[in-house]
């Protein structure tokens, strides 16, 4: 465990910005203990100012970590070591005394719902990595708020890091700087420690001037101590500790203790032509279009969608029983490939300035490029790939890494919701689950009850490309789109969701499931998607008001034949889009039951077992 050292240390590190005396006592102790351990040359207490940000960006440009993209205003490109490009589930752990606090004990094999590490193993791993790991580098102290500063739903963290890329990215993704330090006072904060794991002088040359230590990468969460400790990776999901580490893994555990929800969900506001507005939250696995839905331009005349957040929602019932949600983030950390003027015009407008791109391709005129950008190149313009080599479409490999990213301020989104920073949050009236299902699952259905809706979330599955190319596409279980992000035992998480129905005066949101990705026999999508998805949101909007007509099926309520507004669309095969096959659903419920019984085992709530049985029975009577 991180050592609890005595106060008043004789730090050899020189404080180059800020003053230790100005820090709250607990923050100062956290900093001094870890500075003594990691031995940086300098300490820089971040103030979050424009001036500081400009200096750090300039310094990274000089060191070759960032390149300036001259086509845009204050936009930058980082190319990472090719071994450090994504979250690494196998090296992401939660440390608790008891394994069962972190994951249910599966019937056989390993848990797919998280990775547990014992306290003893973590202590060994920590002591093998952190002593002296920041030698020759600067330790940056990043005070940050998840959620609007001062909101009752917000939480504060302090991240210590030796990566200026992390500082610049955290300034976009969180509210960061002096105002946060002033707000901490004697209050609680989550302690975040990050190192790229490359003390100076270097033992090996860097690739792309990108410091990382892939052999020793470890991302650990210590929920009982409110600590997140990350070593060896500079990539966003592993190093921007406010993101998945805090906002989902740590926060879901805090939420369980404090009676709220921390979820992998977008939040959007939708307004009908009469000016009535509702807020919806939606959970989809990666690459199923969360950001596209959150920033949609509706094709339906008179309808308007506005974005509160594209990735994470913190939700809590207020005294009146409304489920209130905030977006704890301050920016978007979006997947670049596939983003275009056609698929997401609002994202394209958002990223024209003040944006850090990572592992996308660069054009010779100082622009960015990726697969699916759908923009013609000016004549004579060449492309340099994310591997820093000249690239042409004949190369047989992508110019941008499939997980390449843009990190951009949410405030720049042209359709950001007026209430996106509202301290009390926005009232959620509908929750949407969804996945990429080429067969069997209809475009939309509504859960029969809160309990049934929780089961629908637990049963979420989505098509993923297997790592081994020859395996083709497989359908993966991804309950609540949270499978890589649960901060505690998934069985207890389900019980926590079910308990929301007991909340006094709770106005429970309706729960829906969508599938934009169903295909016909020729492998063509049956539904056009993107802006046309507003037609499905319209039906949900009217369902929440008790207006739209439905048909009861074994899996839930679907729209009656004429209930979806298809005006202006070409031919849509509604029969195929909404068909529910007995054979398919018998197999589906069997797979779901096996997964939940194997993986959640003794911790599966009896309400979920009852929902499985009831669904089986309804299907058998088809």
Curated annotation (Swiss-Prot):
Record-listed GTP binding positions: 287-292, 405, 436, 530-533
Ranges for region Omega-loop = 457-487
For this chain's record, the cofactor binding note is: Binds 1 Mn(2+) ion per subunit.
Source superkingdom = Eukaryota
**Amino acids binding substrate:** 87, 235-237, 286, 403-405
Effect after changing residue 71 to R: Abolishes acetylation and increases protein stability
Q: Name one GO biological process term.
A: oxaloacetate metabolic process
A GO MF term: protein serine kinase activity (using GTP as donor)
Q: Which compartment or compartments is the protein found in?
A: Cytoplasm, Cytosol; Endoplasmic reticulum
Instruction: Using the record's annotations, give every residue carrying the modification N6-acetyllysine.
Output: 70-71, 91, 473, 521, 524, 594
Q: Name the cofactor(s).
A: Mn(2+)
Question: Tissue expression, per UniProt?
Answer: Major sites of expression are liver, kidney and adipocytes.
PTM Phosphoserine: list the residues. Answer: 19, 90, 118, 286
Which post-translational modifications are recorded for this protein?
Answer: Acetylated. Lysine acetylation by p300/EP300 is increased on high glucose conditions. Lysine acetylation promotes ubiquitination by UBR5. Acetylation is enhanced in the presence of BAG6. Deacetylated by SIRT2. Deacetylation of Lys-91 is carried out by SIRT1 and depends on PCK1 phosphorylation levels.
- The Phosphothreonine modification is found at 178
Outcome of substituting residue 45 to T: In PCKDC; decreased stability; no effect on phosphoenolpyruvate carboxykinase activity
Which HAMAP family has this protein been placed in?
A: PEPCK_GTP (MF_00452)
Q: What does this protein do?
A: Cytosolic phosphoenolpyruvate carboxykinase that catalyzes the reversible decarboxylation and phosphorylation of oxaloacetate (OAA) and acts as the rate-limiting enzyme in gluconeogenesis. Regulates cataplerosis and anaplerosis, the processes that control the levels of metabolic intermediates in the citric acid cycle. At low glucose levels, it catalyzes the cataplerotic conversion of oxaloacetate to phosphoenolpyruvate (PEP), the rate-limiting step in the metabolic pathway that produces glucose from lactate and other precursors derived from the citric acid cycle.
Record family assignment = Belongs to the phosphoenolpyruvate carboxykinase [GTP] family.
Q: Which NCBIfam families match?
A: PRK04210.1
Question: Any extra detail in the entry?
Answer: In eukaryotes there are two isozymes: a cytoplasmic one and a mitochondrial one.
* Subunit structure as annotated in this protein's UniProt entry: Monomer.
Linked pathology is: Phosphoenolpyruvate carboxykinase deficiency, cytosolic: An autosomal recessive metabolic disorder characterized by impaired gluconeogenesis, hypoglycemia, hypotonia, hepatomegaly, hepatic dysfunction, failure to thrive, lactic acidosis, and elevated tricarboxylic acid intermediates, particularly fumarate, in urine.
Protein's name according to its UniProt entry: Phosphoenolpyruvate carboxykinase, cytosolic [GTP]
User: What organism is listed for this UniProt entry?
Assistant: Homo sapiens (Human)
């Amino acid at each position: 465990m991180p050592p609890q050292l005595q106060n008043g240390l004789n730090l050899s590190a020189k404080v180059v910005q800020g003053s230790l005396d100005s820090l709250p006592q607990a923050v100062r102790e956290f900093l001094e203990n870890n500075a003594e351990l990691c031995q940086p040359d300098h300490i820089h207490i971040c103030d979050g100012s424009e001036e500081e940000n400009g200096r750090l960006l300039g310094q990274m440009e000089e060191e070759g970590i960032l390149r300036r993209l001259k086509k845009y205003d204050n936009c930058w490109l980082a190319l990472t070591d090719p071994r450090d490009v994504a979250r690494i589930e196998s090296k992401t752990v939660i440390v608790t005394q008891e394994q069962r606090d972190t994951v249910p004990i599966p019937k056989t094999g390993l848990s797919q719902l998280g990775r547990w590490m014992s306290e003893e193993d973590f202590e060994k791993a920590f002591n093998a990595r952190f002593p002296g790991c920041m030698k020759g580098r600067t330790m940056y102290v990043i005070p940050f708020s998840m959620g609007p500063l001062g909101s009752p739903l917000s939480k504060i963290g302090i991240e210590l890091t030796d990566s200026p890329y992390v500082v610049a990215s955290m300034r976009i993704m969180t509210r960061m700087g002096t105002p946060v330090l002033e707000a901490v006072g004697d209050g609680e904060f989550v302690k975040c420690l990050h190192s790229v794991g490359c003390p100076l002088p270097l033992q090996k040359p860097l690739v792309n001037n990108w410091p990382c230590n892939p052999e020793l990468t470890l991302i650990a969460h210590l929920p009982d101590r409110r600590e997140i400790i990350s070593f060896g990776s500079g990539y966003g999901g592993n190093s921007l500790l406010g993101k998945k580490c805090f906002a989902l893994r740590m926060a879901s555990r805090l939420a369980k203790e404090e009676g709220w929800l921390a979820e992998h969900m977008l939040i959007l506001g939708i307004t009908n032509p009469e000016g009535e507005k509702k807020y919806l939250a939606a959970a989809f696995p990666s690459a199923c279009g969360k950001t596209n839905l959150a920033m949609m331009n509706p094709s339906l005349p008179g309808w308007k969608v506005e974005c509160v957040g594209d990735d994470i929602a913190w939700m809590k019932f207020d005294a009146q029983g409304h489920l209130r949600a905030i977006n704890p983030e301050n920016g978007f950390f979006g997947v670049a490939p596939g983003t275009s003027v056609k698929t997401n015009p609002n994202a394209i407008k958002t990223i024209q300035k003040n944006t850090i791109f990572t592992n996308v391709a660069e054009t010779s005129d100082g622009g960015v490029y990726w697969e699916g950008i759908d923009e013609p190149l000016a004549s004579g313009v060449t492309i340099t790939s994310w591997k820093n080599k000249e690239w042409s479409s004949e190369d047989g490999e992508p110019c941008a890494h499939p997980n390449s990213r843009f990190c951009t301020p949410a405030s720049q989104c042209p359709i950001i919701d007026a209430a996106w920073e509202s301290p009390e949050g926005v009232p959620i009236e509908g929750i949407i689950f969804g996945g990429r299902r080429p067969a069997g699952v209809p475009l939309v259905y509504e859960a029969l009850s809160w309990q049934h809706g929780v089961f629908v979330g637990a049963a979420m599955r989505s098509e993923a490309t297997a790592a081994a190319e020859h395996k083709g596409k497989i359908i993966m279980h991804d309950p609540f789109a949270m499978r890589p992000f649960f901060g505690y035992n998934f069985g207890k998480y389900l019980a926590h969701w079910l308990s929301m129905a007991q909340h006094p005066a709770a106005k429970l949101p309706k729960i829906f499931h969508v599938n934009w990705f169903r295909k016909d026999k020729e492998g063509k999508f049956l539904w056009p998607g993107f802006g046309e998805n507003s037609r499905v949101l319209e039906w949900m909007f009217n369902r929440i008001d008790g207006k739209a007509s439905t048909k009861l099926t074994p899996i839930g309520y679907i729209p009656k034949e004429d209930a979806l507004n298809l005006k202006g669309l070409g031919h849509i095969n509604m029969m195929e889009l909404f068909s529910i096959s007995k054979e398919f659903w018998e197999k589906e419920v069997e797979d779901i039951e096996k997964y939940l019984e194997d993986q959640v085992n003794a911790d599966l709530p009896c309400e979920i077992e009852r929902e499985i049985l009831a669904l089986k029975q309804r299907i058998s009577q088809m």
